[in-house]
Amino acid sequence: MNYLRGHAVMPCRMQRGITATWGNFHLLDFMIYNGYSFKLMKRINGIIWLSFILTLIIAGPGNAYRLPADLTETCDPVLQKGLEKSLTSLNLEKATHHKSLSIVLVDITDPSSPRMASVNPNEMMYAASLPKIAILLGAFERISNGEMTLDPQTLETMTHMIRNSSNQAANEILNRVGKAYLADLLQSSRYRLYDPEKNGGLWVGKEYSKAGAWKRDPLHNLSHGATALQVARFYYMLQTGRLVSPELSRQMKSILADPAIKHKFVKGLKSVHPDSRIYRKSGTWKQYHSDSAIIEHDGRRYIAVALAKSSRGGKWLSDLIVAMDDLIFKSAPADLAKN
């Protein structure tokens, strides 16, 4: 970790990766998830299919299709410099210096080669309703295990929890999932969405009500917390089909679409790109403002996460998303910019 004018900046290191299998997620899953027809896959048989398998074997584990093992290993110097310049232009340097603002921006147009920039990515902050995405993950894990049913009523309740940020819906789903189950899931080796070695992450330690906390996060005593990095990891795993399964990742993403609350990222982005697709969850409580999204338009896809502690935080995020969107397009590698 280095520091630029007092705020934490993730070092830009050489990207490393993992090979064709990620936990329960395999290369074939990735190909199907990203649009390859199953019928087409079946047609790849005989010598062609054998050649494909032999190619993977001969290439060895170091050369098979990769996704990064950790987003912190994908820092892009051009994107990083652009983000820092944008913060200066928006007069937000002081906020980052005092750790009142944390940001992660990841270009995932090519999911096998993400480009990340960040400021204070591991700063744990109160995130209000944003951690409802963790409840969504817990529900789909239960569904995958046959312990919950994805019936129309459950789907409607989860959609209301995410798009309208309904506290009542969140509490209903949280109690069906189980508080202890969710806490264990977030800390599991499979997801590490709450990681003590990275200063925490996504945490849901109480219902969204006046009731007391069930279990505050171990490091910072927060009831509903997040770091920008772990939220970005959630969205990256979602987009690459690694939350629960490729099919259930798609269903979770569809629930995150069409946000009903039009502030922060949505307000800023729709003012300049009204046709953009936003898969999003935000949070607001007093001076705490957070937003997170996968954003798609004009051939590019990226993850944006920002957490702020300021009465002006909502305005910060509306302005920031416009600058980050512009940066994604201006900093795109030449080969991708043509797509």
Model-derived segments and spans:
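Bacterial N-terminal signal peptides
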Residues: 49-57
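Structured C-terminal helix/loop/strand segments within mature extracytoplasmic catalytic/sensor domains
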Residues: 65-87, 223, 233-339
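A short, well-structured edge-of-sheet supersecondary motif
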Residues: 82-120, 295-296
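Active-site SXXK
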Residues: 124-148, 161, 304
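Short, well-structured active-site flanking segments
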Residues: 141-159, 245-249
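Mid-domain, small-residue-enriched loop/turn segments at the edges of structured enzyme/sensor domains
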Residues: 173-243
